[in-house]
Amino acid sequence: MSYKNCIINGVKEGKITDEQAKKQFEMLDELKTYYLEKKGLSQTEAERVAAKQTYDQTAIDAAEKLRYTILQKNKINEILNVFKTYRNINGEVDYANAYRALMAHDNFSNLPNIERIVDIERGKAHRLMANLLDQMKYKMGGRQTKLQKANLKLMVRELMGETTGNKNAKQLADAWKKTAEHLRKRFNYFGGKILSRENWGLPQIHDTLLVRQVSKEDWIDYILPKLDIDKMINERSGLPFNDKTIREALSEVYENISTEGMATFKPGTNSFGRALHNRRVDHRFLAFKSADDWMEYQTRFGSPDPFKTMMEHINGMSRDIAMLKILGPNPDATHTWAIGMIKKQTKIDAALEAQGKFKRKKLVKYRNEEDRSNSIIENINNLYAFHKGTLHKPIDGFFGRTFAALRQLLTSAQLGGAAVMAITDFHWSRITSKFNGLPTYKANKNAVKFLAEGIKKDKALSRTAIRSGLIAEHWSTVAGVQARYLNEVDAPFWSKRISDFVLRGSGLSHITQSGKWAYGMSVMGTLADESGKVFSKLDQNLQKQLQKYGIGEKEWDIIRKTKLYDASIDEDTIAKGKVVLLRPDDIHARADLDDATREFLTTRLLNYITNETNFAVPTSSAKGRITLAGSAQPGTFKGEIINSVLMYKNFPITLGMTHLNRGFQQVGLTGKAKYLVPMIIGGTLMGALAYEIKQVAAGKKPTPPEKMGTKYWLNAMVYGGGLGIFGDFLFSDQNRYGGSFEKTLAGPVASFWGDAIKLTFGNVKQLMSGEKTNAGKELAAFIQRYTPGSNLWYTRLVVERIIMDTLEKLLNPNFTSDTRQNINKLRSRTGQEYWWSPGEITPN
């Protein structure tokens, strides 16, 4: 009986579906044609070989589907166990909060979650390419030197199988190959399906807008001559493409890119396209003939920067790996199931609540269980959309990009002094170290070393941090540090380069990165120092924290037997025994442990380090963003209003969700006081220091001790909490920029438009009504307030006195009297004098 008859009988007997039969018929015909036309086999032999290959491929597909089904089922059982064992702050079973804990950090469980796993996977990838990151990291303003660009081109040639003879380019290419292969294996380990391909090289970044500008045929005609068809495999049959099938395949690729995946959307389903475990096959599909072909395509339809392409690949893969690890091979299906389970349990609890048989402790007395659960479900759905990336996409692209660019420019004009506020990180790092039973000085001492290394050519400590699995945020992104103050995810690259220039130039980027690396290495160094001790002999606070993250006596006994890493092995400038670390990834490399144990212990330890680092250097979180902004997207009126209101307010919100939350979780009033009182006092003192430094940088003398009253210390407390601009209202009805409380609360974007309208239409209105205008003064103030880089803390005063004051003298006829009035106001309000008075070319 022929194989076709077997397929027909299979359908009749109900063993396979019509859809499965159709796929097998198509594969059988394609294989038969290939062996007849390309291999010259006889009709009988071609049918036999095609039948066998179709059968084998069908069996492989069935095995893969079975693996996927088992992994998906196991993941659902795992999450169901989390639902049953999780306890909220009141010690109650709580399905909704249990599932939310898998999306973002939860202070009551410390479960590995998508947000933290993304960071962990990025760190693992960066670890394998420390030297590449060191050589190719962006300079100030997202700039790349001519040498970097030349070396990147040589590296691309090596990746595409060309021999350049450049040893360094070969080493960089090998580092990227190792990193990309690591990501592929991690993706597959958690249920993905990415086949290995020799000389794969690099993924492609497709700019949807650029691809849409040409027709499908024009795009295919452009890319087809650049592709190495022999290296491209038809995923369905496993055979090389012919002239017909390659155009059909490229047609699908075009539709996928131009519609952002919507071409495969089926109405009535919860998602579109392939399940995540299959989706990553696409970026390996296109195989270019040469490095020149790849670079020409990227220049025309993507990104011509290979380094950016690599970093975006790492970020995207890390996100997808995290989704697979936490939610299984089909996250959409898992999410739908989980929400269904939460709703089911909510209905049961709500019915019991109505009968008086169920009562939950809650802050809002008259809120029933169904209302509470629905609120959390809404939050969860938004978190899931955030992790998938759908919340980052502007609804109206032009509107969204315009306002994103404006926020970047405002950042470059207004955050030049934020580095001064970042000195409070030393305080947060100290109290986090103490809470975790670590030496309180160690992280801050390391941070100073990293800061000192920043002005040296040798970056040995930085490379060591990256090799230890700590993320190289400062080295791999442009304007990445602004996440501490903005909710910005994407913006036009030119605007990000401007803000990056200021953020790096001010030192904020380096201070933030140094603090994170320093704390992470402090933890690993302490664990190395303590590795000779059994669990019961560890510091009580360290024991307590490790147990919270799922590391007890049994786990510690395995972890502490891991071979310690001495950084002198890789860095000649580090003395032997000077930097010794217990690195989580070295646990993963142990041959004496099974896969599950290695993965479990490595994840738990990295989750501990990564999460506590975000306490040591408070950084914005997905939970914080979603709690405040909800489902608001860029490119909508609602989204842009919310982004404006929240601009620069991320840091205090983060403090509230980390340290303040942790303080209130401590047992009893004594426990709460032990955490919160030192936190507030230390934060206030650091806030006062930051405030006085900024006063001196603005040309003012420090505040006289006799003027340091209640208002002063309240202002210092507000400064320490990252809301310095609101502290101004303790002394005046305007902030330091002349804005009202309402304008400050509305955010910088609203203030910008308000000032722009006042400068233009406001002055025209005054002129037409015969009122006196202050157009010159307002224009000078507008230029000073909104010029990128004008408020860098170490150049601001020179710019103000020599350039801005001179400009205002020309534009404002009342400059002298206005200046005298401002000096008198300052003296009356705070008792301060200027050491470099406004309007003077030289200091007093």
Per-region residue spans from a language model:
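Non-transmembrane, interaction-prone alpha-helical and coil segments associated with secretion
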Residues: M1-K638, T816, R820-N844
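Small-residue-rich, membrane-active alpha-helical segments
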Residues: A419-D490, W494, G639-P843
